[in-house]
C-alpha cells in the first residue's frame, strides 16, 4: 500500500513537471524594443511583450546593468514607454506573464537596451566605391580619437537594425580604429551602415552614431541605356544638360553615378509612348567631366541595383558634346587634327612676330645712322666755316645729290688756300 502511494505521488510530480514545461515553452513571450534597442541619450523607447495567449499583462525584470527601481514589483499593460532614457535604463531585460498564483509563464529571450550618445561619434569611411558588384567585397574603416576598446558596426534596412558586428579596436597614438571586410556581396548584405565605439567596462553605453554610408549591390538586373538629349528635344536651361536613362524593365527608380560615385537621389521612372521606362536627369551648369552611368532599381529593394549602363563621357562643363566609348577613337582623331592646326598657327604667328621685330630694328638702325651722318655733316660744316674766317671771303657752293656720299673738292688743300684766294672754290659733298 505504501509503495503504491509513493508510486502515485512520483507519477503525479513528473506529470506536473512535464505539463509545466510544455505550457511554459508554448507560452514563451517575445520582448521587443521600438524604434530600436539602441536608444540615443534623452530619447524614448517602447518595450513590448507579446504572447501566443494574447495576454496584455506582463512584468519586466533586469538581469544586467544598473538597478531600475521602476520595475520593482510593477505590472505593465502590454507595452511600456521608458524615457527620456539615461544610463540607468541600459542593461539586459526579460519579460514574463503572471498566469495565476505561484505559476508564471516562461521568460522571454534577453533583450539588451543600449544607450548611445555617451561619447563623441567616430568616423566611418569606405575604402572603395559604395557601388559593389555582385560577389565583390568592400572594406569599411571606423576610427576615433577616443581610445575605445571595441567598435560596433550596424547595418540598417528601412530604418530597422538588421545585423551588428562587434570587433576589438586597435590602438595607436592618435586614437583607435578597426576595419571591416564585407563580402562576397549579396542582396542580404547591402544597406545603410553606421558604427559606434564602446568600452569594455561600460558595455551598454556607446558613443554617438557615425555618419551613415549606403552600400548598394549592382549587376542584379539587366543594364539600362544612357544618352544625352540632343537637337530640338534637348531640355536645356541656360547651360544645363539633360541625360536620359531608359530600360525595358519596369524599374521604379533610375539612379545616376559619376566615376562610380552615386549622384543625388534617384529619379522616378515614367513609361514612355514606346512602352519603355525612362527618367531624365538635369545636370547643373557646372558639369564635372567624367564617365556617367545610370542604374535601375525597385522601390521595395532600393539598395539592389541593375548592372550599370555603358559609360557616357562628358568632357567639359556646360553645353558640351557627350561621347560613349564607341565614339572615343573618332573624337581622338578629330582632336589631333585640331591640335595640329593650332600648333601650325602658333608657329606662323611666332615667325611673323620675329620678322616684324627684325625689320623694326633695321629701320631704327638706319634712322640712327642717318641722324649720326647728319650730325657729322654739321660738325664738318662748322669747321670749314671757321677755317675760312681768316681768309678772304670766298664763294662756297654745296650741292646735295640723292643720298650717296660723294665728295668732290675743287679747292686745293687748306694750306694752299692763300695762293688761290682769288679763285672761286667749289665744294660739293653728297651725303647718304
From Swiss-Prot:
This is Killer cell immunoglobulin-like receptor 3DL1. Receptor on natural killer (NK) cells. Inhibits the activity of NK cells thus preventing cell lysis. Disulfide bonds join 49-95, 142-195, 245-294. It is a single-pass type I membrane protein. Keywords: Cell membrane, Disulfide bond, Glycoprotein, Immunoglobulin domain, Membrane, Receptor, Repeat, Signal, Transmembrane, Transmembrane helix. It comes from Mus musculus (Mouse). The keyword Disulfide bond applies. Its main location: membrane. The chain crosses the membrane at residues 336-356. The gene is Kir3dl1. Residues 22-335 are extracellular. Residues 1-21 form the signal peptide.
Amino acid at each position: 500500500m505504501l509503495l503504491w502511494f509513493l508510486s502515485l505521488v512520483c507519477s503525479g510530480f513528473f506529470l506536473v513537471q512535464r505539463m509545466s514545461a510544455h505550457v511554459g515553452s508554448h507560452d514563451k513571450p517575445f520582448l521587443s524594443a521600438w524604434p530600436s534597442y539602441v536608444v540615443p541619450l534623452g530619447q524614448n523607447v517602447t518595450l513590448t511583450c507579446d504572447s501566443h495567449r494574447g495576454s496584455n499583462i506582463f512584468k519586466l525584470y533586469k538581469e544586467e546593468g544598473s538597478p531600475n527601481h521602476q520595475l520593482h514589483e510593477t505590472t505593465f499593460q502590454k507595452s511600456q514607454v521608458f524615457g527620456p532614457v539615461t544610463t540607468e535604463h541600459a542593461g539586459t531585460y526579460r519579460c514574463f506573464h503572471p498566469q495565476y498564483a505561484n505559476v508564471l509563464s516562461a521568460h522571454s529571450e534577453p533583450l539588451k537596451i543600449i544607450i548611445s550618445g555617451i561619447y563623441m561619434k567616430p568616423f566611418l569611411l569606405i575604402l572603395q566605391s559604395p557601388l559593389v558588384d555582385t560577389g565583390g567585397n568592400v572594406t569599411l574603416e571606423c576610427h576615433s580619437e577616443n581610445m575605445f576598446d571595441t567598435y560596433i558596426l550596424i547595418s540598417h534596412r528601412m530604418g530597422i537594425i538588421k545585423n551588428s558586428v562587434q570587433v576589438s579596436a586597435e590602438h595607436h597614438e592618435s586614437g583607435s580604429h578597426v576595419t571591416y571586410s564585407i563580402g562576397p556581396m549579396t542582396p542580404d548584405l547591402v544597406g545603410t551602415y553606421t558604427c559606434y565605439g564602446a568600452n569594455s567596462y561600460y558595455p551598454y553605453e556607446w558613443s554617438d552614431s557615425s555618419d551613415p554610408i549606403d552600400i548598394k549591390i549592382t549587376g542584379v538586373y539587366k543594364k539600362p541605356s544612357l544618352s544625352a538629349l540632343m537637337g530640338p528635344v534637348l531640355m536645356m536651361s541656360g547651360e544645363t544638360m539633360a541625360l536620359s536613362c531608359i530600360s525595358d524593365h519596369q524599374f521604379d527608380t533610375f539612379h545616376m553615378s559619376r566615376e562610380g560615385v552615386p549622384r543625388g537621389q534617384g529619379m522616378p521612372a515614367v513609361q514612355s509612348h514606346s512602352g519603355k521606362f525612362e527618367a531624365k536627369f538635369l545636370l547643373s551648369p557646372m558639369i564635372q567631366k567624367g564617365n556617367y552611368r545610370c542604374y535601375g532599381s525597385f522601390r521595395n529593394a532600393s539598395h539592389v541595383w541593375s548592372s550599370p549602363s555603358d559609360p557616357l563621357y562628358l568632357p567639359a562643363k556646360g553645353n558640351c558634346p557627350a561621347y560613349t566609348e564607341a565614339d572615343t577613337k573618332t573624337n581622338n582623331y578629330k582632336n589631333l587634327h585640331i591640335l595640329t592646326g593650332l600648333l601650325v598657327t602658333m608657329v606662323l604667328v611666332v615667325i611673323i612676330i620675329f620678322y616684324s621685330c627684325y625689320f623694326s630694328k633695321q629701320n631704327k638702325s638706319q634712322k640712327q645712322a642717318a641722324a649720326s651722318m647728319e650730325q657729322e655733316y654739321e660738325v664738318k660744316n662748322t669747321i670749314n666755316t671757321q677755317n675760312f674766317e681768316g681768309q678772304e671771303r670766298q664763294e662756297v657752293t654745296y650741292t646735295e645729290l640723292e643720298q650717296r656720299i660723294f665728295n668732290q673738292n675743287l679747292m686745293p688743300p687748306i694750306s694752299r688756300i692763300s695762293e688761290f684766294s682769288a679763285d672761286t672754290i667749289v665744294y660739293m659733298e653728297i651725303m647718304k
